[in-house]
Amino acid sequence: MRWGSVILAALFEIGWVMGLKHADSALEWICTAAAVVMSFYILVKAGEKLPVGTVYAVFTGLGTAGTVVCEIALFNEPANIAKLALIGVLLCGVIGLKLVTNEEKGEAS
């Protein structure tokens, strides 16, 4: 489940990005810092086993999409058709990259 670790890293990324905007207490800032560390640690470990370019693209794509969706769902950020369509396009690209990338680092399709 190597790609699962990329998804986990992206979830931590969403957490720390949300924390940067919304943290108000010392505990929230500590959790934000911990999420940064976990996010990048898991990302680096995934990059040791998978092609790093694709790993990073999937990580940032999922993190970006997840952050936008969380802002809309949790913090009443305005949503519009264009924003949601572009998130859909981004996710299609991320899924496409994952589908055309072999599991082992250094292998090409």
Curated annotation (Swiss-Prot):
It is a multi-pass membrane protein. SUPFAM superfamilies: Multidrug resistance efflux transporter EmrE. Keywords: Cell membrane, Ion transport, Membrane, Transmembrane, Transmembrane helix, Transport. InterPro entries: Small_drug/metabolite_transptr (IPR000390), Small_multidrug_res (IPR045324). GO terms for molecular function: transmembrane transporter activity. The keyword Glycosyltransferase does not apply. Pfam families: Multi_Drug_Res. The chain crosses the membrane at residues 3-23, 26-46, 55-75, 81-101. It comes from the Bacteria. One of its GO terms (biological process) is monoatomic ion transport. The keyword Transmembrane helix applies. GO terms for cellular component: plasma membrane. It is found in: Cell membrane. Belongs to the drug/metabolite transporter (DMT) superfamily. Small multidrug resistance (SMR) (TC 2.A.7.1) family. YkkC/YkkD subfamily. The efflux pump is composed of GdnC and GdnD. Probably involved in guanidinium transport. PANTHER family: GUANIDINIUM EFFLUX SYSTEM SUBUNIT GDNC-RELATED (PTHR30561:SF7), SMR FAMILY PROTON-DEPENDENT DRUG EFFLUX TRANSPORTER SUGE (PTHR30561). This is Probable guanidinium efflux system subunit GdnC. It comes from Bacillus licheniformis (strain ATCC 14580 / DSM 13 / JCM 2505 / CCUG 7422 / NBRC 12200 / NCIMB 9375 / NCTC 10341 / NRRL NRS-1264 / Gibson 46). The gene is gdnC.
